[in-house]
Amino acid sequence: MKLTCVVIVAVLLLTACQLITAEDSRGAQKHRTLRSTARRSKSELTTRCRPSGSPCGVTSICCGRCYRGKCT
């Protein structure tokens, strides 16, 4: 019974701490888009879509549209 109470109190304290820190950090990151694109390499930024004539499927993204397994 004591162990159950201790576990419940610990979970409540940890939850409260997470909620407090989440509210404090709200709006702290000013430039989200700048930071997310800075982590990407140049090859990831330039090869987002496949050119026309390339094979396409579920996992590949065409610059135009995928028609019968080829980018158009």
Swiss-Prot record:
Signal sequence, start to end: 1-22
Molecular function terms, GO-annotated: calcium channel regulator activity; ion channel inhibitor activity; toxin activity
UniProt propeptide residues: 23-48
InterPro entries linked: Conotoxin, Conotoxin_omega-typ_CS
Key words of the record: Calcium channel impairing toxin, Disulfide bond, Hydroxylation, Ion channel impairing toxin, Knottin, Neurotoxin, Presynaptic neurotoxin, Secreted, Signal, Toxin, Voltage-gated calcium channel impairing toxin
Positions where 4-hydroxyproline occurs in the chain: P55
Compartments reported by the entry: Secreted
A GO cellular component annotation in the UniProt record: extracellular region
Disulfide bond annotation, renumbered to this chain: C49-C63, C56-C66, C62-C71
Tissues and organs where the protein is expressed, per its UniProt entry: Expressed by the venom duct.
Recorded domain comment: The presence of a 'disulfide through disulfide knot' structurally defines this protein as a knottin.
Family: Belongs to the conotoxin O1 superfamily.
Functional note: Omega-conotoxins act at presynaptic membranes, they bind and block voltage-gated calcium channels (Cav).
Record's protein name: Omega-conotoxin-like SVIA mutant 1
Species lineage: Eukaryota, Metazoa, Spiralia, Lophotrochozoa, Mollusca
